[in-house]
Every structure is written in C-alpha cells, then in structure tokens.
Amino acid sequence: MHTQKGSLTMAVIIVSNCLLGCTCRYKGDDCRNEQILKLAENNTIIGVCPEQMGGLSTPRDPSEIVDDKVISSAGRDVTAEYMRGAETALFLAELNHADFAILKAKSPSCGKGLIYDGTFTGNKIPGDGVTVQLFKKHNIPVFTEDELDLLPL
C-alpha cells in the first residue's frame, strides 16, 4: 500500500537485511547494496532476515534446499526454522501492506528463480527459496538485487 510523504507516493518495500548492510548472512557478512539503500529516500523500507527471525544464529552453517527440506552443510534439518522465518517475514509484509519485496538472490530463504542445488558444490538450479515461495502464494511480488530495473516504482 503506497503511503504519502508530502506530494510523493511512497512504496512499502520488504528488503533482505543483508542487502541493507546488516551482517546477518550465514558467514556473518553482508552484501550492502547502495542502490537499494537509496530507495529509502522516497519509500518505506522494512528489513527482514528470515533465517535470524526463524531462530538461526549468525554465523551459521550454509544451508540448501534438498527436495522439500532445508538442510545445513552439517546435515541438520533446518526446515522448521526457515519456515518460521518465512512466516514472520510474511506477517510483517502483510501487516505493513507491502507493495513488493527485494530479497537476496540464490538464498535458500530469499532466492528467486535460481537457488543452490542441495549438493553444496556451488551448482545452481531453477527454484525459489522458502520465503519467496510463501510470498508468491500470498501474491506479494518479489524481486532480487539483480532485478532492480524491473521494480514497479
């Protein structure tokens, strides 16, 4: 739901916290994106990290989707944590009437269209992360940091 700021119409955008500069990625780093940060000048940005919101620590073992489960490189099934984080992100998106989301590409949580194949070898396959799947089911448009030219602004 667009909001007003003076004469400007502002979009409400859910954004992966790592893209905003938060050190929440699995290895404890970020992937700050200045172009996304600039969107905060004229839009409402709501940061999320589904992995942390689901109860996972930072740093943490990398995880990949294997069949319908999310498995860490140590062999631990972390599907429940990923689902809990996705549901929390969805709650925030719906509560704030988000117009769309910008989520981290290739992540098992936030990846859209392309994710790692579950072998922990760096190979990628077509697919969506857990949060993206849930957002799509609830008709929340999702973009990655590689699709900023497609944003409906």
Ranges and model annotations:
Residues 2-4, 32-45, 85-100:
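Short amphipathic alpha-helices and their capping/turn segments at secondary-structure boundaries
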Residues 4-8, 23, 53, 63-88, ...:
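Divalent-metal-activated hydrolytic enzyme cores
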Residues 9-14:
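Extreme N-terminal starter segment of soluble prokaryotic enzymes
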Residues 18, 104-107, 147:
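Short, well-ordered beta-to-alpha junction loops that form the rim of enzyme active sites
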Residues 31-72:
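Short, surface-exposed acidic-centric catalytic microdomains
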Residues 104-115, 119:
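Internal, conserved structured core segments that host functional sites
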